[in-house]
Amino acid sequence: MNQTWRAHLQSKLQQLHKQGQYRNLYVTEQAEETWLIRDKKRMLNLASNNYLGLAGDERLKEAAIACTKRYGTGATASRLVVGNHPLYEEVERSICDWKGTERALIVNSGYTANIGAISSLASRHDIVFSDKLNHASIVDGIILSGAEHKRYRHNDLDHLEKLLKMASPEKRKLIVTDTVFSMDGDTAYLRDLVQLKEKYGAIIIVDEAHASGIYGIGGAGLSHIEKNLSQKIDIHMGTFSKALGCYGAYLTGDEIYIEYLQNMMRSFIFTTALPPSTLGAVQKAIEIVKEDNERRENLIANGEYFRTKLRDAGFDIGNSSTHIVPIVVGSNEHALRFSKRLQEAGIAAIAIRPPTVPVHSSRIRFAVTSQHTIADLKWAIDRIIHIAKEEEIFV
């Protein structure tokens, strides 16, 4: 191996170790279940994005198997070559019916959706206004676009409006936000954001990754909670990999936006399409979430119970109002030690550190699901409180 490169990479890895930011892969079994297995130890799964418990649902498995038997295991090409399987049209039509939009485009992941859409729409002639706590894929898309990047303080609409006022009138404006923030569990003020985009002649993209399947009528997303709000949003992005228990993502909105992305989005054009099995499972998942109010109600109730108990116990859970509940502890070392103790006690709870979250805000990110029982959550809360007292992490 080239010794210059070896020395450079070793130095970088040593730096990550020293900063408490080195990452490992751990084999995990039964991650689709409420209780998983890691290092031969059974743990309560409070780290998964399988919010509605659909990743292990027999109906999705059967749909995936049926599509594999009928159509094979691979897409064989990109969608623009010969990989545009008949199921794509069916699922995209289902998404439009679900979201009330004109056209949809299925892509391979939420990350490729965001980097592709933003870098295709925006250029050096434009300004993108982005919430400071938006997902990394949004940030990366803005960087790739070459657009002027204006970050507004988290959920601070006064700051956003100030930036909009200061923007050059010659430049096109794009606002982008998560709807549910993945590391904090709070939500964007969508109605106010839409008012600002209309006032200043911008367009808006919303990332519904952690809201699709959960909020709004039929689980269509946070943008569907308020009447007539979703139609004022230009592009909706959502994933199939979280509440829907599958894989992949979608972009949906007016015909012209999706037509443009289909022709310009490099992360869509230059990649092999999703396999038929995934599309079959996604179609079944959409059918289920549109009708299964009980799963959504259970998830929302479990989130409220878990948040309330942790907040009452004195933990810093920020402004969480959803099924994602962080305990912010500050340093990488505290987060890693707390995570280790929790896993030893039988709770799958993962330390989240920079650059995923801002410096000095390392945390344990808990995610409850609709499948957890109150007994499960109470059992976990008792152990979380006990370990936190021993580790002296209360604020």
From Swiss-Prot:
Source superkingdom: Bacteria
In-chain residues carrying the UniProt-annotated modification N6-(pyridoxal phosphate)lysine: 242
Coiled-coil residue spans: none
Cofactor list: pyridoxal 5'-phosphate
Protein residues bound to substrate: 23, 135, 356
GO molecular function term, any single one: pyridoxal phosphate binding
Catalytic activity: 6-carboxyhexanoyl-[ACP] + L-alanine + H(+) = (8S)-8-amino-7-oxononanoate + holo-[ACP] + CO2
Enzyme class: transferase
E.C. number(s) listed in UniProt: 2.3.1.47
GO biological process, one term: biotin biosynthetic process
Alphabetical UniProt keywords: Biotin biosynthesis, Pyridoxal phosphate, Transferase
Tagged with keyword Hydrolase: no
Pathway where it operates: Cofactor biosynthesis; biotin biosynthesis
Function: Catalyzes the decarboxylative condensation of pimeloyl-[acyl-carrier protein] and L-alanine to produce 8-amino-7-oxononanoate (AON), [acyl-carrier protein], and carbon dioxide.
Family, similarity comment: Belongs to the class-II pyridoxal-phosphate-dependent aminotransferase family. BioF subfamily.
Subunit structure, as described in the record: Homodimer.
NCBIfam families given in the database record: bioF (TIGR00858)
The protein's name: Putative 8-amino-7-oxononanoate synthase
Organism, scientific name: Bacillus cereus (strain G9842)
Gene expressing this chain: bioF
